[in-house]
Amino acid sequence: MAALVEPLGLEREVSRAVELLERLQRSGELPPQKLQALQRVLQSRFCSAIREVYEQLYDTLDITGSAEIRAHATAKATVAAFTASEGHAHPRVVELPKTDEGLGFNIMGGKEQNSPIYISRVIPGGVADRHGGLKRGDQLLSVNGVSVEGEQHEKAVELLKAAQGSVKLVVRYTPRVLEEMEARFEKMRSARRRQQHQSYS
C-alpha cells in the first residue's frame, strides 16, 4: 500500500524565517535595515501569492523522482506562471467545493476563439459567489494542476466537470483583456446580423 503524501505547506517555514529575522534584529549583529527589508518581503502579499501557487503546483504536478527533483520542477513551473503574468495581476489559487449545484460561474474564450479562457460571469448566490476569491475578468490558468492556457474551451469545461470533491483554480485578474474580447465578439455578432439582414433584403 502506497504511503499518503502530506500536502506541502510552507506557511510555517515562512513564519519561522520571520521569527529568526526578528531575533537577528534584536541581537544587533547585522544591519537592521536589510533584515527589516527581508522581513517585509516575506510578509508581503506577493510572497504569499508565490507560496500558494508553488504549493498548489507541488501538490498537483505529475513528477516522479526525488523530493529535490520535484521541488526543482515545481520552482520552474512557479517561475513560468509568474513570468507569464508579467504586466498583469499575479496568479492566485482559488479552491471551490464541487456540489450538485455546480461551481457558480461561466467561462468564455479558448484556442478556437484565439483568446484566453476567462471567467465571464460569477452567478449571484452561487458557490463561487458565496466562497469569494473568484471574479469576472479572471483568466483561468489551470484546473486542478492541469494548464488550460492555449487550450480549447471544451477542455476547460471537461476539467471543471470532471473535478471531484473540490476544484483548485489558478487564476489571474486581467479584466481589460476580457472587455476587449467581449467587444470583439460583439462586433462579430453585429457583422453576422448585418449579413443576415442583407441576405433577407
UniProtKB/Swiss-Prot annotation:
Gene Ontology terms: cellular component: basolateral plasma membrane; bicellular tight junction; cell-cell junction; MPP7-DLG1-LIN7 complex; postsynaptic density membrane; presynapse; synapse
Membrane topology value: Peripheral membrane protein
Keywords associated with the record: Cell junction, Cell membrane, Exocytosis, Membrane, Postsynaptic cell membrane, Protein transport, Synapse, Tight junction, Transport
Cited PANTHER family: PROTEIN LIN-7 HOMOLOG
Protein purpose: Plays a role in establishing and maintaining the asymmetric distribution of channels and receptors at the plasma membrane of polarized cells. Forms membrane-associated multiprotein complexes that may regulate delivery and recycling of proteins to the correct membrane domains. The tripartite complex composed of LIN7 (LIN7A, LIN7B or LIN7C), CASK and APBA1 associates with the motor protein KIF17 to transport vesicles containing N-methyl-D-aspartate (NMDA) receptor subunit NR2B along microtubules.
Record text about domains: The kinase interacting site is required for proper delivery of ERBB2 to the basolateral membrane.
Family: Belongs to the lin-7 family.
UniProt-recorded name of the protein: Protein lin-7 homolog B
